[in-house]
Amino acid sequence: MASTMTPYFGIVVSLIAYGIGTLLFKHSKGFFLFTPLFVAMVLGIVFLKVGNFTFEEYNTGGKMISFFLEPATIAFAIPLYKQVDKLKKYWWQILSAIVVGSICSVVVVYIVAKAIGLDTAVMNSMLPQAATTAIALPISESIGGIPAITSFAVIFNAVIVYALGALFLKTFRVKHPIAKGLALGTAGHALGVAVGIEMGEVEAAMASIAVTVVGVVTVVVIPMFMPFIG
């Protein structure tokens, strides 16, 4: 049955939850568990559960916000355009690093899922987590995954990279700005780009191209991978 809830309901809930997350993140001086996106997701779930609202009632307006995911992803091209000279010079190294990273992500998720005995539907939901939400959700649906789990996996993955990405790079002594950006974008998509922006223009540009290429590689690789794990 179609929801009769006004579209403003989902929009207002999302904005308030995100606003609370922003305030918590600011006042906690950047504590990673208070990343606005993660806080908004948790608060949204709690609100719907406590208020006994259905997801369909929320999503009447929530899907209007989701509509802007794809345009937001395209906006990653802006910092990339500013560093197009480096892209031309190192295009092969950049492309190969992202492709290998993307494939490794899918393989590692599969191995871990099998090792801990995850249900097939849950495993399929986790496989596209390296891509942005706009790309990961359709892939998840097409391979029999659960979009809600995929969304959580994508966001949680990004939160970890946002919180610990810089520390990992320092620990493993990754100093080249191109390598830093590629690592952040490949592992953490949008929030990885956010960390790259904090580091510099080169890191931001490389993280942006990584997000885009990872999405393309994920779309191609996962359907090819599925017959071998079915």
UniProtKB/Swiss-Prot annotation:
It is a multi-pass membrane protein. The chain crosses the membrane at residues 5-25, 30-50, 61-81, 92-112, 126-146, 149-169, 177-197, 209-229. It comes from the Bacteria. NCBIfam families: PRK04288.1 (NF003291). GO terms for cellular component: plasma membrane. One of its GO terms (biological process) is cytolysis. The keyword Ligase does not apply. Inhibits the expression or activity of extracellular murein hydrolases by interacting, possibly with LrgA, with the holin-like protein CidA. The LrgAB and CidA proteins may affect the proton motive force of the membrane. May be involved in programmed cell death (PCD), possibly triggering PCD in response to antibiotics and environmental stresses. This is Antiholin-like protein LrgB. The lineage of its organism: Bacteria, Bacillati, Bacillota, Bacilli, Bacillales. Pfam families: LrgB. Keywords: Cell membrane, Cytolysis, Membrane, Transmembrane, Transmembrane helix. Belongs to the CidB/LrgB family. LrgB subfamily. HAMAP family: LrgB. It is found in: Cell membrane. InterPro entries: Antiholin-like_LrgB, CidB/LrgB. Its main location: membrane.
